[in-house]
């Protein structure tokens, strides 16, 4: 079962449906790490002043919004936190609209909604109502301190929440400046019939298991082949790291010996012998000193 990333309730009117939210997608792309080819050590990112090229310490970094070209308004962390919406743990439905009314470019991220044991029947009621009316629910919800516009729609036996982009984030089709050859095209009836016939000949069903990411498949096949041939590059360890490892091994050995001596109910015999030898050497040394005197 997918891990819940949010728990709360769907609210519309006086109805509350306790639910949990889980991601409907996962990132499965190839993750290329940057490496120093001389030692295979990972290469990280530095905070750099883009003008001077010098690295900047964290305490000297502030957040600002460019208000005019080259001029910024600086905001403190406290001011930014105060602007975050208050989390109510509620998916608050405020309207129901036709499912075909929302343009696809507004869709953002999908999530699955799962009811808890108390909310199963009401959850099913909302899902079935949306299915029969052809409507989707519009709602407000706060996720990870960010306010989102979202829609709820049925998907087989479940309900899906899809976050929507705010209108200010969506570019208008007017910006494409499509000319009359597109907007007022005079299409030949015979050409339309031929195109329609081609579409019908190529008609199929949605079969997601048949669609493959060929780039990822080829890269992973190449990785497996190289690994099988022993073409693996390990990070080179510095000498001081090896020294620390040796210290750890010695300490482990000492701890084991200490535990054995405790289990034996007395001092470690090796320690007793070493102590006796040390005392003997001390007495012998003292006797030689007196004779020389």
UniProtKB/Swiss-Prot annotation:
Family: Belongs to the prokaryotic Ku family.
Stored Pfam families: Ku
Biased composition (Basic and acidic residues): 265-280
InterPro entries: Ku70/Ku80_beta-barrel_dom, Prok_Ku, SPOC-like_C_dom_sf
Annotated GO MF terms: double-stranded DNA binding
Physiological role: With LigD forms a non-homologous end joining (NHEJ) DNA repair enzyme, which repairs dsDNA breaks with reduced fidelity. Stimulates rNTP addition to DSB and end joining (ligation) of linear DNA by LigD, on 3'-overhangs and probably also 5'-overhangs and blunt dsDNA breaks. Binds both ends of linear dsDNA protecting it from exonuclease activity.
Region (Disordered): 260-293
Keywords assigned by UniProt, alphabetized: DNA damage, DNA recombination, DNA repair, DNA-binding
HAMAP family: Prokaryotic_Ku
UniProt record, GO biological process: DNA recombination; double-strand break repair via nonhomologous end joining; positive regulation of ligase activity
The name this protein goes by in its record: Non-homologous end joining protein Ku
Subunit-structure text: Homodimer, may form higher-order multimers on DNA. Non-dimerized protein does not stimulate LigD ligase activity. Probably interacts with LigD.
């Amino acid at each position: 079962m997918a891990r819940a990333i949010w728990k709360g309730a769907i609210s519309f009117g006086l109805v509350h449906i306790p639910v949990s939210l889980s991601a409907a997608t996962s990132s499965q792309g190839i993750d290329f790490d940057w490496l120093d080819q001389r030692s295979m050590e990972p290469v990280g990112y530095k905070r750099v002043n883009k003008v001077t090229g010098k690295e900047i310490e964290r305490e000297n970094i502030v957040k600002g919004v460019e208000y005019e070209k080259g001029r910024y308004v600086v905001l403190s962390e406290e001011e930014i936190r105060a602007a975050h919406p208050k989390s109510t743990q509620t998916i608050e439905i405020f309207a129901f609209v036709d499912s075909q009314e929302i343009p696809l470019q507004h869709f953002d991220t999908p999530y699955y909604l799962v009811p808890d044991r108390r909310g199963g029947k009401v959850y099913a009621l909302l899902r079935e109502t949306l299915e029969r009316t052809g409507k989707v629910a519009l709602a407000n919800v706060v996720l990870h301190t960010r306010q989102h516009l979202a829609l709820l729609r049925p998907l087989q036996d479940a309900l899906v929440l899809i976050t929507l982009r705010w209108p200010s984030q969506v570019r208008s089709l007017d910006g494409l400046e499509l000319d009359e050859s597109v907007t007022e095209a005079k299409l030949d009836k015979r050409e339309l019939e031929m195109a329609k016939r081609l579409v019908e000949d190529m008609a199929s069903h949605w079969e997601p298991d048949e669609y493959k990411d060929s780039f990822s498949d080829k890269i992973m096949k190449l990785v497996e082949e190289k690994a099988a041939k022993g073409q693996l590059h390990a990070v080179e360890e510095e000498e001081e790291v090896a020294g620390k490892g040796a210290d750890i091994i010695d300490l482990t050995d000492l701890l084991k010996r200490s535990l054995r001596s405790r289990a034996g109910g007395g001092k470690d015999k090796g320690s007793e012998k070493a102590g006796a030898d040390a005392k003997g050497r001390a007495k012998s040394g003292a006797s030689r000193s007196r004779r020389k005197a």
